[in-house]
């Protein structure tokens, strides 16, 4: 049960540590050493200590935007073997990239400058907090001598109080540390990193700009491996929770299981599948849990998303007389405007450290992974719900065949995306109609899938794609991005080319913010059309490997995909798909109307 983070292999040396950005070859970093090499007394600086600790927990890429308060720190991060500095176009994308990297690797890091950089990355860190991702946000701070004086510094709002950035981060991180002296710097750094890993949340670490190059005896010692004390269940509480749940489920006629997004933070995906195997229950996932458990299991029935669930899934879940939700998040988006047809007295809610059984007892200090494992040993086999699903299930039809040179429909696009998926691929779905179209994709074993549902920040996918692809070198990542979202964060396609990534981006150009149109339409949802392939070609500028294509019909799409998977397989492939402005999934139409109704509820009587 003990977790020694120091046993996580460090990354091999980057080929070009001298420049901010990925090495020209961008070859993946094989993990080689369990512990960073000891440094000499002359190298025992604060900056190198931080770099070594990042490598030790599995970070081999730090997404950064340089600024005068963090330049010396960046020098020391670059000097660390095994640590790459990936220079991003802006701080928001650096934060999104750290988010995507944490999804692929388990932990991510970004480095920005004081206040102007920190407040720019804040939105991305809030998103990582909402998704329970350990991201270490490092900010270069003012000279330690300036704290406590009446000096007014640049990159501030003109006050001698330098705490504005810290106060902003207090609400979106689980731990904050401001390092202004060397005496306890090692302890502050280690505590921040350990807290991020333990809580699975972002942390904020500010380091005064005059400290990274300074040595201190605490930095020359061989660092103690991180030790995260495991969270253990209260044995009596665990036994009582299992007993109450077994009684609840065993008397049900057609119970079902539903996996939620907190399976990730609880590291309970395998325990959930083991429970499926032991119980024989039909199981579904909430939309934000897609990709966390296998979809190739015979008892998988799809995505449960209320009125916009995949075919026949909602009927089975909502007609069950008992449903166990493992790690759910019920918000207005996931509940389709609070329109779920679920009853509390039929539900068992299992959170990472808590179990609630129907209208009855709640059991605290019960770890989800341990609870599901114990439950699997005692629950009776019951395949009734799955057998009901098989009786009513009708295989999904195919989109209508396209006429020659017929304008491309979005459902035809996703028919072809489905054929591209395998165990060596991953899908990034941007906020918008891609949420709904990608939910219908059937993921092969080992195929990754990520999207940001709780926070739902448009533009997230561009930076997240950069970070995920950098962290998962063994996968070819396919991103589905709307034109409105792309306009928010497009610049870091540049960084993808610089890092020699070979992701495939489908840019769906339908002329506006389609998801907003279906919630509440207005002229503000119409955007200026760009020449998207021309933009990416300009960013490419003949440097690195990048290929673009603009497609308007199925024949052109088929040809473009063939090129992306064949001749251009080593290139970043950008395929602009021209779609009609009203070409949306039926799920978005239904979801949008229900969320709109929830948003427009009148005030309660006072």
UniProtKB/Swiss-Prot annotation:
Organism: Oryza sativa subsp. indica
Family as reported in the entry's similarity comment: Belongs to the TPP enzyme family.
Binding residues annotated for Mg(2+), in chain numbering: 483, 510, 512
EC number(s) reported in the record: 4.1.1.1
Binding site for substrate: 68, 155, 516
MF annotations from Gene Ontology: magnesium ion binding; pyruvate decarboxylase activity; thiamine pyrophosphate binding
Subunit structure: Homotetramer.
Keywords in alphabetical order: Decarboxylase, Lyase, Magnesium, Metal-binding, Thiamine pyrophosphate
Catalytic activity: a 2-oxocarboxylate + H(+) = an aldehyde + CO2
GO CC list: cytosol
Protein name, per record: Pyruvate decarboxylase 2
Chain spans, region Thiamine pyrophosphate binding: 433-515
Cofactor: a metal cation; thiamine diphosphate
PANTHER family: PYRUVATE DECARBOXYLASE, PYRUVATE DECARBOXYLASE 2
UniProt lineage: Eukaryota, Viridiplantae, Streptophyta, Embryophyta, Tracheophyta
InterPro entries in alphabetical order: DHS-like_NAD/FAD-binding_dom (IPR029035), PDC/IPDC-like (IPR012110), THDP-binding (IPR029061), Thiamin_PyroP_enz_cen_dom (IPR012000), Thiamin_PyroP_enz_TPP-bd_dom (IPR012001), TPP_enzyme_TPP-bd (IPR011766), TPP_PDC_IPDC (IPR047214), TPP_PYR_PDC_IPDC-like (IPR047213)
